[in-house]
Amino acid sequence: MASPRAAVVLASMPDHPDAHGQLSPDTGGTVAVIVVDHGTRRAEANAGFESFVRASADRLPYPIVEPAHMELAEPSIASAFDRCVAAGATTIAIAPYFLGPGNHWDRDIPALAEAAAAGHSGIRWLVAAPLGPDPRLLDLVEIRLAHCLAHVDGRADECSACAGTGRCILR
């Protein structure tokens, strides 16, 4: 079995043949994914994240995909972990919805996952790499900036993130 560090390295290499949701045949089991963000007291922000995770479940090659918030809101990592196990997961990959490695990725999320796993004997888990640094994020930054600048210039509607907020204005 690969170490958690090896699994983190594979998760940071999206073009690696072993990084596409499959465990080796001798490992077996059902893989679940928990996508975790920081969490906020703003209900609409949490709802937007949870909607994103539900939509991503249709694209990800895993039978179980759950949202979780690290703090400040439910579902927590512990409750998402419980739901994954109840749905039949034997391995849980926790995907941080964070741009870079920091204390949350290095310490907080692993500690919360360890506590959640304590009640589930035989369940394996890992915390995957954060989203960046990944050069594909530059494409997203470029697209977002171009759209926002086109909007304030009157050439495009507001993007879905800003729609109705009154925030996408040139001051």
Name each region found by the language model.
Residues 1-171:
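Active-site-proximal alpha-helix that buttresses catalytic centers in soluble enzyme cores
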